[in-house]
Amino acid sequence: MRILQRALTFEDVLMVPRKSSVLPKDVSLKSRLTKNISLNIPFISAAMDTVTEHKTAIAMARLGGIGIVHKNMDIQTQVKEITKVKKSESGVINDPIFIQAHRTLADAKVITDNYKISGVPVVDDKGLLIGILTNRDVRFETDLSKKVGDVMTKMPLVTAHVGISLDEASDLMHKHKIEKLPIVDKDNVLKGLITIKDIQKRIEYPEANKDDFGRLRVGAAIGVGQLDRAEMLVKAGVDALVLDSAHGHSANILHTLEEIKKSLVVDVIVGNVVTKEATSDLISAGADAVKVGIGPGSICTTRIVAGVGMPQVSAIDNCVGVASKFDIPVIADGGIRYSGDVAKALALGASSVMIGSLLAGTEESPGDFMIYQGRQYKSYRGMGSIGAMTKGSSDRYFQEGVASEKLVPEGIEGRVPYRGKVSDMIFQLVGGVRSSMGYQGAKNILELYQNAEFVEITSAGLKESHVHGVDITKEAPNYYG
């Protein structure tokens, strides 16, 4: 029998406090998603069909993190999810949605409803701006067969030229009391759009994670060999692809990664792995970040069904030991129950953590609401569950094309308590990490990694760490017993 190492998880260890002059409110949580993409907070929502679609992704990016849209949908639907995130807000919308004057109000309604916008610029066949259609123009219109050109606000409009700053645009919009400012070139061709909502969101969400065009960042999951899906997602503006597999150290994953890096200009996160060798091979094949974790998730049964995996603390430590030599970020995926677990993962060298169960219970997650014994819950399932595998994740567990009655699941379906908005959950997690960094005297995540010292604790130590000897009469928002 070959025993490679003693393996530990989050509940097996604690960080030792250090002399500190650092206050939690003064620490920086900036980190990296990949070697080329930054994060303002080290949190990622998981690519699971009960966790991340566009609503969760938008909420995460506004707070400074990022969401990874799951792949249990056809390519066009996933592309639409990415587009919704990308068009949800922007400093300057460089490719604005527009409509032509001969279209009907019914056509315009489809566009505004689909993209959740309140109006659209109107252009002619040459792309020249000829008007704008807003809620004010259509508010009292009942005949949706009318032409857009008969109802729109016609030129001349208040416009701005390419290159205007957001501050200048804000002053101009305030002066003329308008909510939308079309951007045109010298020939009056529509080139962009600035909305008052985007300017307000810049103030409301100062830590929002945005790309070079002022759009929210978002990632998307793909499976083995899905180069066509990857290409469509890149065209839609996705910031990073997550090549998602239960076993990231497989020949097909390595081959797919190499093909993507040859044909597309996009950062690729690859996982999941738990060993030094796997990390090294993924980096050699072109991975821009390595995702770590086999079996730590609350809904994952891989370790029991297959007898394979590694406790998460040791897995992170293994992978960081290799990835840090190449300056490749490590993402700790799974096993996060408390903010203290996040702090431990970051102290071990992870650049960010991926969260499923804690976000599955939020308002923005796509899971179904349910009532059980008078309390609100939301559905949550592993991507290795029967339900998720029949919807499209079977390739993640190397069972693509297998009949539903022949699938061997590596996950379960369940429910989690409703936890309010994504922002409420992230607020508590961020607060816990800040507190930990204060105890460690760490001004930033790199210092946390450099400073942290761990002790291994016993089962008695774990029992002492949790609430004991008292009945909880009022639940805390960051402690679940």
Language-model region placement:
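Short beta->alpha transition motifs characteristic of CBS
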Residues: V69-D74, I117, P121, L128-L144, ...
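Bateman/CBS regulatory modules and CBS-like beta-alpha motifs in cytosolic regions of diverse proteins
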Residues: L23-N40, A46-M48, T77-Y115, V122-D124, ...
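Catalytic beta/alpha-barrel core
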Residues: V69-N72, F98-I99, G119-P121, T159-H161, ...
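Catalytic cores of alpha/beta
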Residues: K55-I58, D228-A236, V274-V292, A332, ...
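Active-site-adjacent beta->alpha loops and helix N-cap segments on the catalytic face
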Residues: K25, M73-T83, E141-S145, V189-N209, ...
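Glycine-rich phosphate-binding active-site loops on the catalytic face of alpha/beta enzymes
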Residues: R62-T77, V238-S250, D288-A306, I336-F369
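Alpha/beta catalytic cores of nucleotide-metabolism and tRNA/nucleoside-modifying enzymes
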Residues: M1-S21, H161, A285, G307-A332, ...
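Short beta-strand/loop segments at the ligand-binding rim of alpha/beta enzyme cores
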Residues: S38-I44, G91-P96, D211-A220, E259-V274, ...
